[in-house]
């Protein structure tokens, strides 16, 4: 009833049960909202099986990166929930930085589909009159702020890669119109892994 078969995490029903708990959360409670990026792009370019694998990888990596005493569940689709107990704002920031480092390390094994996500959190200690649902709504709003920031960072990185490609072609004293074939071997995030150029 409470298991998400695709990821092995607690499912939406369990997440909703925890969020609807009328008991006021303890002051040390934190709620984190995670949202995967680029799932639609992966589904469209590589197929839904690749998208499902992307979700599973994130779920496994997130659960492994979080201490066992913290709850991690899937609220649906590409969205996940974590409920923490104990960390203050600084400690939770450090924990989320640790999670990001662990997921970046996991992504090195999958250069074509590195894990990209946004996260926001809210603490009961900062919102003493809030219930669990209120904390989740605040965390979700903060997640969307982070999502816009992540998208801007990825767009800037994409532009830098395009500029590097242009510099490489210029160093060869060629232009794109000279190329008989150019294989940049771009992954779904337009990251250049290797290149081969053949010119007329």
Annotate each PLM feature:
Residues 18, 153-170:
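Active-site core of bacterial EAL-family cyclic-dinucleotide phosphodiesterase domains
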Residues 48, 85, 89, 93-100, ...:
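Catalytic-core segments of nucleotide cyclases and related cyclic-nucleotide turnover enzymes
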Residues 113-118:
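PAS and PAS-like sensory/regulatory domains
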Residues 198-199:
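Short, intrinsically disordered C-terminal tails of secreted or membrane-associated proteins
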């Amino acid at each position: 009833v409470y298991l998400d078969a695709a990821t092995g995490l607690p499912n939406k029903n369990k997440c909703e049960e925890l969020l609807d708990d009328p008991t006021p959360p303890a002051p040390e409670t934190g709620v984190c909202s995670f949202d995967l990026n680029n799932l639609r792009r992966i589904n469209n370019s590589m197929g839904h099986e690749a998208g499902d694998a992307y979700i599973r990888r994130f779920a496994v990596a997130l659960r492994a990166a979080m201490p066992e005493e913290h709850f991690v569940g899937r609220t649906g689709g590409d969205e996940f929930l974590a409920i923490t107990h104990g960390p203050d704002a600084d400690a939770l920031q450090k924990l989320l930085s640790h999670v990001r480092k662990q997921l970046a390390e996991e992504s090195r094994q999958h250069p074509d589909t590195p894990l990209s996500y946004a996260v926001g959190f809210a603490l009961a200690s900062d919102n003493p009159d809030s219930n669990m649902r209120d904390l989740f709504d605040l965390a979700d709003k903060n997640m969307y702020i982070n999502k816009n920031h992540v998208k801007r960072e990825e767009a800037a990185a994409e532009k830098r890669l395009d500029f590097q490609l242009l510099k490489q072609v210029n160093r060869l004293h060629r232009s794109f119109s000279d190329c008989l074939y150019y294989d940049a071997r771009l992954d779904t995030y337009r990251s250049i892994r290797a290149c081969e150029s053949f010119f007329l």
